Amino acid sequence: MLETRFREYIRRFNAEDDTAFDDYLAPDMHMKNGTLEFDGVDGMKHHYRDLIWPHFTERLSVPRFVSDDGRAAIQMHTLFTARRDAPDTLFGAVRAGETFEFDGVIMYEIDDTDRFSDILVAYNSFVHTDLDGNRRDLGIPH
């Protein structure tokens, strides 16, 4: 996968355009993110459309990208900002404005249609910052 194509995926993801999953994921894609695993385009859409984006703005940045014919790897920084107070999210109870910062490495297996067939997320850190500015490393959140 060319870096320009990958960065277009990130742009669409940051715009919360879940049709990007139709264009970039293999129908039987498998994702492992910490202890959370799900399959397929519908699994990815459910995760983000129903569990993440209603509660958080999520912005990805990719300072490093490498690829060959069958895989890509990136360094990823992600900032989640709670949209509103919510008692029950994937990250637990949150208050509007609290943030969660992910730093890690993600490996993508790419099929012959130039779509992601497997996504493996590895955490370096996951940090919660409360409204008083207190930061706490959470390890793997789910």
Outline where the language-model segments fall:
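C-terminal and inter-domain tail/linker signature
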Residues: 1-142
